[in-house]
């Protein structure tokens, strides 16, 4: 779950959840899909109770594993902006801006509460080796091109991607 907690944990914005589709060996940020929270069956009351009990305000992500029988096992909660959270912004919900306006200006801006459709996120170079191994070169290129959200690749600002590309070529 990726979200933002306001009003000491009493008001939660959780527009979606991510599911890792391919996990690289060297990180927990893999090729994933962000889906709308309305399609996810989870115990929202436990999440709400935890964040309101600790009185937390801010960005967060909550991670758990679901077994084959549907039982959830808590892994961790990150009380910070998650590395995968950019896909939520790509989907149209800018959680860091909501948090900024709440924390600095004392207001909750109007915002889109949920995402309309799933967004695929690819961590570009981190995923390349495992992605090509699993999908083949053309399969991975297809996933790269069709992913709506990337960790580095952005047509409006190619600098970080080109820098990292040069680093990998050397």
Regions found by a protein language model. Give the residues of each.
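Broad, structure-driven detector of short, well-ordered beta-strand segments within folded domains
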Residues: 2-6, 62, 118-122
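Active-site/pore-lining binding-face segments in mid-to-C-terminal subdomains
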Residues: 65-128
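Glutamate identity and glutamate-enriched acidic tracts
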Residues: 38, 45-48, 63, 76, ...
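A short glycine-rich, hydrophobically flanked beta-strand micro-motif that places a catalytic Asp/Glu
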Residues: 2, 57-69
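Peripheral (often C-terminal) accessory segments that flank ATP-dependent C-N-forming ligase machineries
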Residues: 101-170
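ATP-dependent carboxylate/phosphate-activation module, predominantly the ATP-grasp catalytic core
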Residues: 2-55, 78-103
